[in-house]
Amino acid sequence: MTLHPAFARRATLAPAAALATGAALLLTAFSPAGPASAQDELACDAEPIVMTTADGIDFVRTPDACFTELPDWPYEPDYVEIDGLRQAYVDEGPADAEVVLLLHGQPSWSYLYRKMIPVLADAGYRVIAMDHLGMGRSDKPVDIESYSYLGHNERLQTFVEELELTDINLFVQDWGSLIGLRTAGLVPDRYATIAVGDGARPGLPAGCGRVPPVEDPDVLTDLQFTGAQIPPQQVPFYDGCEPILDTDPAYFGDWMAYAMTAESFMPSVVVEAMTWFDLPPAEEAAYDAPFP
């Protein structure tokens, strides 16, 4: 079955919301599964091929063609296979050097650290920037049940173990902090230092439960993302925009539905709204690259 063009972008963008929501849009209308070799040769705008792990998890993989000639991004990815799904990362600097592990948030990917990676590598560190499941060049399960907060935690812990990383200098941002801080707390002996940028510790106020699901996303009007209403590089995004910082679970439910279903949603819109310096169009396109 082929996706109607009106829904194609929603489908491939769905995992961008998964990191923050612990869920992804249920996708059932992709073409039949194909071999990984066929996937690797796809054009960037080709219809996704669904592949299946040995455990029966259906997933898609962003074609390599989507990541060519990105500005300030000369890095080739490495991969660790965890439960049949590829976890992508870049690994720069001396292999035996002190480790800096960089964790991005939502809806970005390791491209977020394009300015930091060369500086840290030139300073003599081994720099590892990982893409969370459903983000960047990592595999993207199509079932909403394949994403969870604890699942991201467990994958990160396995990733660290597979690479045999110790004495880690951890830098976390946004949802990378919620994932990374909990993981570091579970195995503190593996971590030497921790730095947090635009992040928070994991936890819920007393009495808070699971965010209620949106009952009918199809009737949700195209939620106006608050950041899009603010001129770029404006401090008031943090100081005066109460809706985006609203703690009402219902608002977060609306954000979930918007990020997973709205055709107007693009990662670059969110990143641009929260970036002090103006982003050139080529860099905005690079943030969107994983979700053509």
Report each predicted region and the residues it spans.
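Bacterial N-terminal signal peptides that target proteins for export
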Residues: 2-20
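A fold-wide structural signal in alpha/beta-hydrolase
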Residues: 121-131
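Boundary at the C-terminal end of the N-terminal hydrophobic targeting segment
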Residues: 36-38
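The serine-hydrolase catalytic nucleophile loop
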Residues: 106-117
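Flexible "cap/lid" subdomain of the alpha/beta-hydrolase fold that forms the substrate-access gate
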Residues: 40-76, 86-87, 92-93, 99, ...
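Bacterial N-terminal signal peptides
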Residues: 15-32
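Hydrophobic alpha-helical packing residues
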Residues: 101, 120-121
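Structural cue for short, hydrophobic secondary-structure segments
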Residues: 102-105, 129
